[in-house]
Structure formats: C-alpha cells, structure tokens
C-alpha cells in the first residue's frame, strides 16, 4: 500500500482534495491510503508515509518541512495552485504516484 499525506493550514481544504484523490484511486483500483492533516500535525502523522503534499499557501514553510521529513525517507512537494483551487484530486493523485516511482 502507498501512503500519501496532504497538509494545509487547518486540514480542511486538503481533506476535500484527499476525498477526491481516494475516489480517483478507487476508480483505478489502486491500493493507496490518503489522509489530510493541518500543517501542525504533519510530524505526528508522518510514520509510514511515502509522499507528503502541501497546499500551495504553505510554500513559505516547504523548506523547513522538507528538512524534517527527508531523513525519514518521505518525499515532499507542493500541490499545484490550480489543482488545489479546483480540487482536482485525479491530477494530485498522479503527482503523488509519480513521486513514488
């Protein structure tokens, strides 16, 4: 199973995207776990995660967060602003899966 964690300010917006990603994954028959948390909850939810995707509004925190998660083997990136705004879960899922290859 591939484990993906999304993070935004409060976990709400990323929660909507996670829901769309789960639907896309289910439609494709993929074995993935997708969760969403607030940026303050990342480290307490990072165990077993392969990819961490941040909302675009957390770009200013990206370097610091990446430094924390990289030693744990977690790949991190920022969700494209357009995908985030339109809740394009399918494209965000593709982004995460590509990072895991």
Predicted segment positions?
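Short, well-ordered alpha-helices that flank and scaffold nucleotide-derived cofactor binding pockets
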Residues: 19, 23-26, 67, 94, ...
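Conserved active-site segments centered on acidic
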Residues: 2-39
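N-terminal glycine-rich "phosphate-gripper" loop used for MgATP/nucleotide binding
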Residues: 54-63
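Short acidic/histidine-rich motifs immediately flanking catalytic phosphotransfer sites
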Residues: 46-51
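P-loop/Walker A phosphate-binding loop and immediately adjacent motor/lid segment at beta-alpha junctions
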Residues: 2-4, 9-11, 62-82
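Short acidic active-site motifs
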Residues: 38-42, 61
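Ser/Thr/Gly-rich flexible loops in soluble cytosolic domains mediating phosphotransfer, phosphorylation
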Residues: 3, 76-101
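Generic structural signal for helix capping and beta-alpha/helix-loop junctions
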Residues: 42-44, 86
